[in-house]
């Protein structure tokens, strides 16, 4: 028996025998098959429906073997993620109309965009666990535009998978992050809360509480010399158990205070001179009034002489 006669008998038997009823599926979108689609992909999609293959038995007819080889072999241009995902969605003996590929593609987009942004592991978990599901679908008559729809959806899924293929481990910005002591962002974050505000260095400097002995020695040194050399400043700081910076700042403040006191004293002296002059002027006016001729005439008139 020749091979062509065996194939013809299978085709005649297939056309005479009514096709088994298959569960109804949701119709996919109607698109036209593009003319530039690769031939292995078209053969794997539009392969002949063998009765023994539909019933689940093992079939060794040439058409079934050829379609199986084309479906199991990856496409020649599979590179990156787009063509590989399209081959996994369409080939492999598990494509059915629009229902065999769409559930698989929807499973890849199951996490929300926010979840994919802050927790990329969720999308990877769905991506790795869902693809084995497409091997359990049964063969159905291929609709005219289901291959193009599956290819377009597979390309979109591949683009999303490529975008999520490199997860950014520092994506959750709002998570609890710990900065180093030298990082200026640490102070910004600490200023937002109220627990660590005591550790934030503010612009105010703590006042040094000098003892009476220290103040006495500093005043004595200032009365003898208002400006200190560095060696003398170090000696005083060591003797009084202070830092060199504390002694320097104290002398600076003391000089400012001394200048203010000098200005205040000069002002007081100037005002006191004015007061004395005004009092003398008033006295002279009073004497002149008492010695005026009118007053003398009055005295003369009152006098009995």
UniProtKB/Swiss-Prot annotation:
Residue ranges of the region described as Disordered: 115-151, 259-305
DNA-binding region: 203-262
Molecular function as annotated in GO: DNA binding; DNA-binding transcription factor activity, RNA polymerase II-specific; sequence-specific double-stranded DNA binding
GO CC term, one of those recorded: nucleus
Record's function text: Transcription factor that binds 5'-CNAATTAG-3' DNA sequence and regulates the expression of numerous genes including genes important for brain development. During telencephalic development, causes ventralization of pallial progenitors and, depending on the developmental stage, specifies different neuronal fates. At early stages, necessary and sufficient to correctly specify the ventral lateral ganglionic eminence (LGE) and its major derivatives, the striatal projection neurons. At later stages, may specify LGE progenitors toward dorsal LGE fates, including olfactory bulb interneurons.
SMART domains referenced in this protein's UniProt entry, alphabetically: HOX
A single BP term in Gene Ontology: generation of neurons
Organism annotation: Mus musculus (Mouse)
CDD domains per record: homeodomain (cd00086)
Lineage: Eukaryota, Metazoa, Chordata, Craniata, Vertebrata
Cell compartment(s), UniProt: Nucleus
Keywords of this entry: Developmental protein, DNA-binding, Homeobox, Nucleus, Transcription, Transcription regulation
Compositionally biased intervals (Low complexity): 141-151
Family of this protein: Belongs to the Antp homeobox family.
InterPro entries in UniProt: GSH1/2, HD, HD_metazoa, Homeobox_CS, Homeodomain-like_sf
Name under which the protein is recorded: GS homeobox 2
UniProt biased composition (Basic residues): 123-140
């Amino acid at each position: 028996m020749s091979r062509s006669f065996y194939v013809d008998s299978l085709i005649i038997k297939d056309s005479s025998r009514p096709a088994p009823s298959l569960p109804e599926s949701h119709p996919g979108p109607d698109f036209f098959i593009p003319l530039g689609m690769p031939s292995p992909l078209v053969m794997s999609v539009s392969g002949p429906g063998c009765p023994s293959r539909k019933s689940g038995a093992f079939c060794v007819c040439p058409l079934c073997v050829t379609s199986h080889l084309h479906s199991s072999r990856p496409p020649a241009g599979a590179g990156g993620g787009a063509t590989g995902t399209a081959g996994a969605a369409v080939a492999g003996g598990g494509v059915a109309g629009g229902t065999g590929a769409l559930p698989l593609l929807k499973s890849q987009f199951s996490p929300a965009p926010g979840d994919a942004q802050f927790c990329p592991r969720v999308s990877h978990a769905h991506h790795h666990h869902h693809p084995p599901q497409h091997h359990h679908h049964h063969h159905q008559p291929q609709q005219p535009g289901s291959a193009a729809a599956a290819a377009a959806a597979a390309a979109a899924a591949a683009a999303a998978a490529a975008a999520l293929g490199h997860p950014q481990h520092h994506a959750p910005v709002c998570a609890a992050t710990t900065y180093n002591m030298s990082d200026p962002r640490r102070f910004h974050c600490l200023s937002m809360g109220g627990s660590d505000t005591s550790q934030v260095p503010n612009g105010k400097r703590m006042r040094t509480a000098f003892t009476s002995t220290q103040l006495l020695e500093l005043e004595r040194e200032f009365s003898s010399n208002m400006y200190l050399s560095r060696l003398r400043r170090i000696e005083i700081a060591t003797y009084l158990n202070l830092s060199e910076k504390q002694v320097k700042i104290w002398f600076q403040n003391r000089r400012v205070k001394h200048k203010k006191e000098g200005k205040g004293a000069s002002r007081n002296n100037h005002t006191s001179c004015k007061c004395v002059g005004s009092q003398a002027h008033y006295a002279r006016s009073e004497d002149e009034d008492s010695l005026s001729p009118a007053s003398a005439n009055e005295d003369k008139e009152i006098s009995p002489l």
